[in-house]
């Protein structure tokens, strides 16, 4: 409330009244609002359309019509599964969408707007053209505007790629999408909604190809793409061969071809992925974690280096002034300043009252100043002539009074080569983890361009920043999961190191002053050598992230301020605290809405659970696809009719792939993700797929030799494939537990029940003694073949990895 009153006072002092309610209403009617037509989220209609009108659903529709035309109704058993898959996919996506929309409202950007002569806070999409808004540090500029009063430093790197801060004064143009680094100004909106720069840029980016996909989604799309390409020509060849070469009836030719096509379609893979990700999104939302980007779940699961800022991440976001003390070596000759401690305190409190900054440090000083005023302390009697907001690159701010200019900031950056003179006075506080700022008098000009005059250190401000209660436990988790921590902060490296040690971060005693890392080569060497980086500029944070990525690491960056945005933008995954700057929260892929860093293990765990389980279940689906593709090629080469019917394929898929695959996707899994998704999935599926095709291929040959009927061969093949399917399920489910045993036993029971009581529905026939004997022999042979093929693939993979020196 006090800050809002201050805003009202400031706006009145420079006679800014803003728009009236009538003027706002008129602009809304004319369509000059800040709402855009660009959305990265699907509408409910788009979700339904994307799930119903798919390429594979079109194929299923065609083969359904063909089966109805030839009267093969029992082979439509796949239809309820396809319809169920589609409905479940739609329902879960819509549920996830509604959950995310509710959570997004909590993180929606707001603006301080001047209307009817007073300041009010509204959502940015409620702004209209010609509105006057107040911009302060940490705010993202929500529409194109022009500065009408004040002075700010703006970072336009998200738009232009240039990391340097740009000064904006009265008359300067502000581009939407940039963010305020420091200072304060009033700006009038000129282009809003679809007409703003960021909207046009977003529209152009959307038309050029949409969002980047995660490795898992790219891999699944690649698999589906190639299956989609080969499925039609193979299907046509199989039908031609069966009907025109082998002389089979239309009904037999259609059903055998449909069986091959159904086997090649990974119909449950997309559904499995969609549902698993949707459930994870909703689960994290209940823990106050908002995902701006779905791929961030997978990326965080693959992270092996986590970069964290100190304030707001390791420590609580709020700071408290601990002590103000005199500088003992104020003069060049080592003498103490002539000013008394009370006089220094008075100056510092006047500085705090005049400062335009609202960061954690200045809020602590302003709280102290407010308390001093309440206690009638002799302070707050100087009027500022000018102010320079704190700069993340310069590491200090300034206020000029009638009697001179005063600086407050990092001692090293204010004193430069004279820092050694006062360093010993700071060390005892830094060793306790306190943030220590230097208050100094400046005798020079143009302090905004750097210090070029004499500086007289007067005193120090020590601020306490308590460690989060759960920080130690959180960092212990990351250590146990093989995730390295890098602490990247703008504070004194000794202070940051001490805080990191208290938080239990491994090797936190290894620290470096980033001011000494003045080349990219030095930064590249430092990322391996040090854990704590102090006095880091925003540009250096970005360079450190890139250096880690260049060494093959998957990097996540957490932060809460505008000085973290550059690094967050280039990190593989970015995480922001909602209590920090609005710009950081909007730029991040993951937002911790309650700003509790202890939720990070939940996000990493959820990502690992989802990716590992999808990877495992995807292997089950691909076994069927590999088998069906290779068996189709086998049938074409040997000029035999495809031996299975669609109903038999549906039976095998239901109990050895579909149901267990979905249940296993909900299993707990904390394992770190290794290797590439498509490689892992293919290598796990290959032994099973090869076993299936060799077993069924040999069975077809035996059937020809011993004149066994096609119906009996189909039944034997179904049972043998089921045996192999459960062997694969056992292998993929390792290590087994009670839940996994229950899933496997339940599906075996379901298959046995269907085999005995639903034989006609699934095209199963009674077997003669020779057929039963053949089934037993092939069952044992398939078990041995699968076991040895699995060992062979694992051995070949191990040899390749050993040779290359990395995980495939």
What are the roles of these predicted feature ranges?
Residues 34-112, 119, 226, 365:
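Transmembrane helix-loop-helix hairpins at the membrane interface
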Residues 58-80, 229-265, 278, 282-288, ...:
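Helix-interface capping motifs at the ends of transmembrane segments in multi-pass membrane proteins
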